[in-house]
Amino acid sequence: MKVKKGDTVVVISGKDKGAKGKVIQAFPQRDKVLVEGVNRIKKHTKVSRTERGAQSGGIVTQEAPIHVSNVMVVDSDGQPTRVGYRIGEDGKKVRISRRNGKDI
């Protein structure tokens, strides 16, 4: 998967099309990413008491994972780009922007 935790991405399709956000978590086995402020859902949680007596629960708004094919990585110029790879001088794979050839 070419999108990693900490990348800035833009949503290219779906209800949040055009939204930018930072990848909070990546799920490579499921090909999904959790993006900050994107694909927000309302989750209904059961009301429960904590040990101090306070109540927690109700309707909670949180981000849901979005498929990796619906996002594109934003390069250093702030434009969405595809991701490529090249071998660096130290022999390690380095991610590059396909749009301008710079390192991501």
Curated annotation (Swiss-Prot):
Annotated coiled-coil positions are none
The UniProt GO MF terms for this protein read: rRNA binding; structural constituent of ribosome
Tell me the Gene Ontology biological-process terms attached to this UniProt entry: translation
According to the lineage, what is the superkingdom?
Answer: Bacteria
Q: Which UniProt keywords apply?
A: Ribonucleoprotein, Ribosomal protein, RNA-binding, rRNA-binding
Q: What range does the record give for the signal peptide?
A: none
SUPFAM superfamilies registered for this protein in UniProt? Translation proteins SH3-like domain (SSF50104)
**Which InterPro entries did the record assign?**
KOW, Rib_uL2_dom2, Ribosomal_uL24, Ribosomal_uL24_CS, Ribosomal_uL24_KOW, Translation_prot_SH3-like_sf
Cite the HAMAP family for this sequence: Ribosomal_uL24_B
Indicate what this protein is called per its UniProt record. Answer: Large ribosomal subunit protein uL24
Source organism per UniProt: Saccharopolyspora erythraea (strain ATCC 11635 / DSM 40517 / JCM 4748 / NBRC 13426 / NCIMB 8594 / NRRL 2338)
